[in-house]
Protein backbone atom coordinates (compact mmCIF):
# COMPACT_ATOMS: atom_id res chain seq x y z
CA UNK A 1 0.00 0.00 0.00
CA UNK A 2 1.27 3.45 -0.91
CA UNK A 3 2.22 5.56 2.12
CA UNK A 4 0.62 9.02 2.01
CA UNK A 5 1.66 10.34 5.41
CA UNK A 6 4.49 10.02 7.91
CA UNK A 7 4.13 11.28 11.49
CA UNK A 8 7.25 11.72 13.60
CA UNK A 9 7.59 11.93 17.33
CA UNK A 10 9.97 14.74 18.34
CA UNK A 11 12.21 13.72 21.24
CA UNK A 12 14.60 10.81 20.67
CA UNK A 13 13.17 10.34 17.17
CA UNK A 14 14.01 13.54 15.27
CA UNK A 15 15.98 15.20 18.08
CA UNK A 16 18.31 13.97 20.81
CA UNK A 17 18.90 15.46 24.24
CA UNK A 18 22.64 16.09 24.64
CA UNK A 19 24.29 13.78 27.20
CA UNK A 20 20.82 12.71 28.23
CA UNK A 21 20.01 11.63 31.76
CA UNK A 22 16.96 11.98 33.96
CA UNK A 23 19.02 14.12 36.35
CA UNK A 24 20.07 16.52 33.59
CA UNK A 25 16.49 16.81 32.37
CA UNK A 26 15.25 17.83 35.82
CA UNK A 27 18.19 20.20 36.30
CA UNK A 28 17.05 22.06 33.16
CA UNK A 29 13.63 22.49 34.76
CA UNK A 30 15.12 23.69 38.05
CA UNK A 31 17.10 26.35 36.18
CA UNK A 32 14.07 27.24 34.09
CA UNK A 33 11.92 27.72 37.17
CA UNK A 34 14.51 30.06 38.68
CA UNK A 35 14.43 32.08 35.46
CA UNK A 36 10.62 32.22 35.57
CA UNK A 37 10.72 33.40 39.17
CA UNK A 38 13.14 36.18 38.21
CA UNK A 39 10.56 37.36 35.66
CA UNK A 40 7.84 37.30 38.32
CA UNK A 41 10.05 39.37 40.61
CA UNK A 42 10.90 41.87 37.85
CA UNK A 43 7.21 42.44 37.13
CA UNK A 44 6.46 42.70 40.87
CA UNK A 45 4.04 39.78 40.71
CA UNK A 46 6.11 38.03 43.38
CA UNK A 47 7.46 40.66 45.73
CA UNK A 48 8.76 38.98 48.88
CA UNK A 49 10.90 35.97 49.76
CA UNK A 50 8.17 34.11 51.62
CA UNK A 51 5.75 34.17 48.68
CA UNK A 52 8.59 33.15 46.33
CA UNK A 53 9.30 30.08 48.48
CA UNK A 54 5.61 29.20 48.53
CA UNK A 55 5.38 29.65 44.77
CA UNK A 56 8.41 27.46 44.05
CA UNK A 57 7.23 24.67 46.34
CA UNK A 58 3.67 24.74 45.02
CA UNK A 59 4.75 24.86 41.36
CA UNK A 60 6.98 21.79 41.72
CA UNK A 61 4.23 19.95 43.57
CA UNK A 62 1.61 20.80 40.93
CA UNK A 63 3.90 20.05 37.99
CA UNK A 64 4.72 16.60 39.36
CA UNK A 65 1.08 15.95 40.25
CA UNK A 66 -0.21 16.94 36.82
CA UNK A 67 2.48 14.97 34.99
CA UNK A 68 1.60 11.76 36.86
CA UNK A 69 -2.08 12.47 36.31
CA UNK A 70 -1.52 13.00 32.58
CA UNK A 71 0.10 9.56 32.28
CA UNK A 72 -3.08 8.01 33.68
CA UNK A 73 -5.75 10.17 32.05
CA UNK A 74 -3.94 11.17 28.80
CA UNK A 75 -5.07 14.74 29.48
CA UNK A 76 -2.31 17.33 29.02
CA UNK A 77 -1.66 20.15 31.47
CA UNK A 78 0.19 22.89 29.56
CA UNK A 79 2.99 24.58 31.49
CA UNK A 80 1.39 28.02 31.04
CA UNK A 81 -1.77 26.70 32.73
CA UNK A 82 0.25 25.35 35.65
CA UNK A 83 1.73 28.81 36.24
CA UNK A 84 -1.76 30.29 36.12
CA UNK A 85 -3.21 27.76 38.57
CA UNK A 86 -0.34 28.18 41.03
CA UNK A 87 -0.63 31.98 41.05
CA UNK A 88 -4.40 31.74 41.48
CA UNK A 89 -3.95 29.36 44.42
CA UNK A 90 -1.65 31.96 46.00
CA UNK A 91 -4.41 34.55 45.43
CA UNK A 92 -2.37 36.36 42.80
CA UNK A 93 -4.84 37.09 40.02
CA UNK A 94 -5.38 39.52 37.13
CA UNK A 95 -2.10 38.54 35.51
CA UNK A 96 -1.86 39.18 31.77
CA UNK A 97 -2.31 35.97 29.76
CA UNK A 98 0.87 36.76 27.83
CA UNK A 99 2.84 36.53 31.07
CA UNK A 100 1.84 32.89 31.55
CA UNK A 101 3.13 32.04 28.07
CA UNK A 102 6.35 33.96 28.69
CA UNK A 103 6.85 32.12 31.98
CA UNK A 104 6.43 28.81 30.15
CA UNK A 105 8.98 29.95 27.54
CA UNK A 106 11.46 30.70 30.32
CA UNK A 107 10.71 27.47 32.17
CA UNK A 108 11.55 25.39 29.09
CA UNK A 109 14.43 27.60 27.89
CA UNK A 110 17.23 25.49 29.37
CA UNK A 111 15.64 22.29 28.10
CA UNK A 112 15.41 23.91 24.67
CA UNK A 113 19.17 24.46 24.57
CA UNK A 114 19.84 20.74 24.98
CA UNK A 115 17.77 19.37 22.11
CA UNK A 116 19.62 18.94 18.80
CA UNK A 117 18.65 17.01 15.65
CA UNK A 118 20.16 13.56 15.23
CA UNK A 119 22.93 13.66 12.64
CA UNK A 120 20.76 11.99 9.96
CA UNK A 121 17.53 13.88 10.68
CA UNK A 122 17.77 16.70 8.15
CA UNK A 123 19.21 14.53 5.38
CA UNK A 124 16.45 11.96 5.87
CA UNK A 125 13.73 14.62 5.85
CA UNK A 126 15.17 16.12 2.67
CA UNK A 127 15.08 12.71 0.97
CA UNK A 128 11.55 12.02 2.19
CA UNK A 129 10.42 15.42 0.91
CA UNK A 130 11.29 14.23 -2.59
CA UNK A 131 8.70 11.43 -2.41
CA UNK A 132 5.75 12.53 -4.49
CA UNK A 133 2.60 13.34 -2.48
CA UNK A 134 4.12 12.24 0.85
CA UNK A 135 3.00 14.49 3.71
CA UNK A 136 4.86 14.73 7.02
CA UNK A 137 4.03 15.93 10.52
CA UNK A 138 5.51 16.20 14.00
CA UNK A 139 3.42 14.93 16.91
CA UNK A 140 4.84 15.50 20.38
CA UNK A 141 3.74 14.91 23.95
CA UNK A 142 5.07 18.25 25.16
CA UNK A 143 3.40 20.65 27.60
CA UNK A 144 4.62 23.78 25.80
CA UNK A 145 3.84 24.07 22.09
CA UNK A 146 6.35 26.84 21.36
CA UNK A 147 9.30 24.73 22.50
CA UNK A 148 8.74 22.37 19.58
CA UNK A 149 8.09 25.21 17.13
CA UNK A 150 11.20 27.10 18.27
CA UNK A 151 13.45 24.08 17.83
CA UNK A 152 12.12 23.15 14.40
CA UNK A 153 12.67 26.75 13.28
CA UNK A 154 16.11 26.99 14.90
CA UNK A 155 17.38 24.05 12.85
CA UNK A 156 15.51 24.94 9.64
CA UNK A 157 13.22 21.91 9.72
CA UNK A 158 9.76 23.54 9.68
CA UNK A 159 9.64 23.53 5.89
CA UNK A 160 9.40 19.74 5.81
CA UNK A 161 6.18 19.46 7.79
CA UNK A 162 2.56 19.93 6.83
CA UNK A 163 1.52 19.98 10.48
CA UNK A 164 3.04 20.31 13.95
CA UNK A 165 0.80 19.01 16.74
CA UNK A 166 1.52 18.95 20.47
CA UNK A 167 -0.42 17.65 23.42
CA UNK A 168 -0.21 21.18 24.86
CA UNK A 169 -2.34 22.50 22.00
CA UNK A 170 -4.62 19.51 21.52
CA UNK A 171 -5.27 18.84 25.20
CA UNK A 172 -4.71 15.07 25.08
CA UNK A 173 -1.52 13.04 25.06
CA UNK A 174 -0.40 10.03 23.09
CA UNK A 175 -1.36 7.15 23.22
CA UNK A 176 -4.90 8.56 23.00
CA UNK A 177 -5.84 7.73 19.39
CA UNK A 178 -7.71 11.03 19.00
CA UNK A 179 -4.47 13.04 18.81
CA UNK A 180 -3.23 10.83 15.96
CA UNK A 181 -6.48 11.20 14.04
CA UNK A 182 -6.42 14.96 14.63
CA UNK A 183 -2.88 15.08 13.22
CA UNK A 184 -4.03 13.20 10.12
CA UNK A 185 -6.80 15.74 9.65
CA UNK A 186 -4.30 18.61 9.96
CA UNK A 187 -2.20 16.90 7.27
CA UNK A 188 -5.21 16.71 4.97
CA UNK A 189 -5.33 12.90 5.11
CA UNK A 190 -8.33 10.67 5.74
CA UNK A 191 -7.12 7.05 5.77
CA UNK A 192 -5.06 6.03 8.84
CA UNK A 193 -3.92 2.83 7.14
CA UNK A 194 -2.01 4.85 4.53
CA UNK A 195 -0.03 6.67 7.21
CA UNK A 196 2.94 5.62 9.37
CA UNK A 197 3.98 6.94 12.77
CA UNK A 198 7.57 6.75 13.93
CA UNK A 199 8.46 7.18 17.59
CA UNK A 200 10.63 5.87 20.38
CA UNK A 201 8.15 4.64 22.97
CA UNK A 202 4.94 2.90 23.98
CA UNK A 203 2.78 6.00 23.50
CA UNK A 204 3.75 6.30 19.83
CA UNK A 205 3.39 2.66 18.86
CA UNK A 206 0.34 1.69 20.92
CA UNK A 207 -1.47 4.95 20.19
CA UNK A 208 -0.67 4.80 16.49
CA UNK A 209 -1.84 1.20 16.32
CA UNK A 210 -5.13 2.03 18.07
CA UNK A 211 -5.70 4.82 15.55
CA UNK A 212 -5.13 2.38 12.68
CA UNK A 213 -1.72 3.67 11.56
CA UNK A 214 1.30 1.61 10.61
CA UNK A 215 3.99 1.90 13.29
CA UNK A 216 7.78 2.21 13.44
CA UNK A 217 9.73 2.04 16.70
CA UNK A 218 12.95 4.05 16.72
CA UNK A 219 15.15 2.30 19.30
CA UNK A 220 16.31 4.56 22.12
CA UNK A 221 19.36 3.79 24.25
CA UNK A 222 18.33 5.82 27.30
CA UNK A 223 15.67 4.34 29.56
CA UNK A 224 13.26 6.60 31.42
CA UNK A 225 10.96 6.06 34.41
CA UNK A 226 7.39 5.10 33.50
CA UNK A 227 8.54 2.98 30.52
CA UNK A 228 5.83 0.58 29.40
CA UNK A 229 6.03 -2.62 27.42
CA UNK A 230 4.84 -2.46 23.82
CA UNK A 231 2.28 -5.19 23.19
CA UNK A 232 1.58 -4.51 19.54
CA UNK A 233 2.14 -7.05 16.76
CA UNK A 234 3.94 -6.32 13.51
CA UNK A 235 5.55 -2.98 14.23
CA UNK A 236 8.79 -2.13 12.45
CA UNK A 237 12.00 -1.50 14.40
CA UNK A 238 14.77 0.87 13.29
CA UNK A 239 17.97 2.00 14.99
CA UNK A 240 18.37 5.21 13.01
CA UNK A 241 15.91 7.59 11.42
CA UNK A 242 17.54 7.09 8.01
CA UNK A 243 16.32 3.47 7.99
CA UNK A 244 12.77 4.76 7.51
CA UNK A 245 13.63 5.29 3.85
CA UNK A 246 13.66 1.50 3.45
CA UNK A 247 10.01 1.29 4.50
CA UNK A 248 8.39 4.02 2.40
CA UNK A 249 6.93 2.78 -0.86
Segments from the language model and where they lie:
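Asp-based, Mg2+/Mn2+-dependent phosphohydrolase catalytic module
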Residues: 1-6, 38-50, 122, 126, ...
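Short, electropositive alpha-helical surface patch
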Residues: 63-76, 153
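Conserved phosphoryl-transfer catalytic core
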Residues: 11, 18-69
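Short, acidic loop-to-helix structural element flanking the phosphoryl-transfer center
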Residues: 73-84, 89, 98, 105, ...
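Long amphipathic N-terminal alpha/beta scaffold segment
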Residues: 94-96
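Flexible, glycine- and charge-enriched loops at secondary-structure boundaries
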Residues: 22, 26-30, 76, 114, ...
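Short, flexible, glycine-rich and Lys/Arg-enriched loop motifs at helix boundaries
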Residues: 16-27, 141-149
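Short acidic alpha-helix initiation/capping motifs at coil-to-helix transition points
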Residues: 27-38, 76-85, 143
